[in-house]
């Protein structure tokens, strides 16, 4: 396949109301071992054009994920990578430093912002302080000159806030690679809400 995904874990430290994964998966889901992920990656041709790292929240498996990322960097020198994360873990300087040290050159980090305020963002993630952690993580990654895509999933809870989100990005997140506006997938929690 020209487009391959590594699903690291179903677990997530947010509980987004529109998440396509069921609540039980996010709370109790399993994770792939790093060794198994490396074994699978060995069977993908080195010239594959694109790889996505996703989850749940892939960084929920902890710092051992960096071993896998380094393996990918060494094997897939010309591959484009997309890392899908809620970005909260990058409020921690240690995670920013480790990612910077091992991330492949042709990488984009896709991070969702659900609102221009903590009230809206945290209301959608159902997680207190997720707004501040996400914004902090984005800004720290930008300071390291990493390529960031902001993802905005539109729902009735943030549709009226799109202009404010755009203003926030323009005013306080210079260096963003691009912004993607995404429709909700009507499965999992999104179907319920």
Across the structure, where does each feature detected by a protein language model lie?
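A short acidic, helix-capping loop that chelates divalent metal ions and anchors anionic groups
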Residues: 27, 117-124, 187-192
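Canonical radical SAM enzyme core domain
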Residues: 25-38, 58-102, 113-117, 127-133, ...
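Conserved C-terminal portion of the radical SAM core fold
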Residues: 51, 107-108, 133-193
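Short Fe-S-cluster ligation motifs
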Residues: 39-58
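Conserved beta-strand positions
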Residues: 53-55, 85, 111, 181
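Conserved phosphate-donor/acceptor-positioning beta-strand/loop module used by diverse small-molecule
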Residues: 12, 111-113
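Canonical Radical SAM [4Fe-4S] cluster-binding loop centered on the CxxxCxxC motif
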Residues: 3-35
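A structural signal for short coil/turn segments at secondary-structure junctions
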Residues: 44-48, 76, 103, 145, ...
């Amino acid at each position: 396949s020209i487009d391959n995904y590594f699903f690291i874990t179903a677990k997530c430290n947010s509980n987004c109301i529109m998440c396509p994964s069921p609540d039980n998966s996010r709370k109790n889901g399993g994770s792939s071992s790093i060794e198994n992920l490396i074994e699978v990656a060995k069977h993908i041709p080195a010239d594959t054009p694109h790889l996505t790292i996703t989850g749940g929240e892939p960084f929920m498996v902890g710092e051992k994920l960096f071993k896998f990322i380094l393996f990918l960097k060494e094997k897939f020198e010309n591959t484009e990578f997309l890392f899908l994360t809620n970005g909260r873990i990058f409020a921690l300087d240690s995670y920013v430093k480790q990612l910077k040290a091992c991330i492949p050159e042709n990488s984009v980090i896709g991070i969702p912002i659900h609102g221009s305020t903590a009230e809206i963002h945290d209301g959608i993630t159902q997680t207190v302080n997720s707004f501040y952690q996400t914004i902090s993580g984005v800004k720290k990654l930008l300071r390291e000159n990493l390529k960031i895509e902001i993802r905005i999933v539109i729902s009735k809870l943030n549709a009226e806030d799109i202009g404010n989100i755009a203003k926030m990005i323009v005013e306080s997140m210079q260096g963003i690679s691009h912004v993607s506006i995404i429709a909700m997938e009507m499965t999992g929690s999104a179907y319920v809400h």
